[in-house]
Amino acid sequence: MVSYKDLGLVNTREMFAKAIKGGYAIPAFNCNNMEQMQAIIQACVEASSPVILQVSSGARKYANQTLLRYMAQGAVEYAKELGKNIPIVLHLDHGNSFELCKSCIDMGFSSVMIDGSHLPYEENVALTKQVVDYAHQFDVTVEGELGVLAGVEDEVSAEHHTYTDPKDVVDFVSKTGVDSLAISIGTSHGANKFKPEQCTRNAEGILVPPELRFDILAEIEKELPGFPIVLHGSSSVPQEYVKIINTHGGALKDAVGIPEEQLRKAAKSAVCKINIDSDGRLAMTAAIRKIFVDQPAEFDPRKYLGPARDELKKLYMHKCESVLGSAGKA
């Protein structure tokens, strides 16, 4: 058993309370390799932002759970080396079983998500409560989910979304004891968050997605005043990255994300954690593809992973400073 406290990490409890009171959201950036982790820490130290290092089950397998634990500890020390002791959470994204959540807690995660949203309601409650009961013994915080997000990201796949029913949230939170709640109000996983028929097109022919269901969010806030709410699938899919990828050998068709002005609006509400994964993938892929085309003789990984890391840092700083409002809150 490894305690996250021995790694220098924190859980989400105080972080979320401050975010709700301050009207901003904590960035939850998905991470599975060294360059991503370096970019996240560099950006959040420079922006003086708290951060959640978010790891999916697939990323945990990819990075190896033991290496990941030491990478997280290294991230804490790296932030100090850069001159800022920012609050850092190590969080399991979309845990789908008690066993996986327990394993992460035992290996030093400070926060876990148990996603039983695909199960019948009472089974979701029972599974979530089982994880909460174990996690809280070690002061690890737990995120549950009500409602289903469409899209594909790592092992998470759903063809259709189901909006969160505000009438269920009080019962779910009281029965499970979760510390935060992921909801479905129209966000979606992946870089193709909406089908073309769900969108309109602007003068340049780029898809314009439908508005998020802020009415549902408002109802949930009324039911659970001051309770931490989480948005998954909140990448904006910057079209400049899509264009670079597609003009350098890629084939991303009709890629569309959540407009940043809608995320700014959400961050000012009870939404205190906003998950961003696909934007980071796009930033890295755009930088690497451009180098492969422009410098075809290059074969030193540092010469393409380094610029990809720099592009990631720029993206993450933008999210902290101009979208989520977390800059200066560490």
Residues of each region from the PLM?
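C-terminal alpha-helical cap/extension of soluble enzyme domains
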Residues: 2, 246-249, 258-330
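An N-terminal domain-start capping segment
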Residues: 1-2, 142
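Terminal accessory/targeting
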Residues: 2-7, 22-28
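Short secondary-structure transition/capping motifs
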Residues: 29, 57-64, 89-90, 308
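Alpha/beta enzyme core
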Residues: 7-21, 34-59, 65-85, 94-228, ...
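Short catalytic-loop micro-motif centered on adjacent basic/acidic residues
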Residues: 26-30, 90-91, 113, 229-231, ...
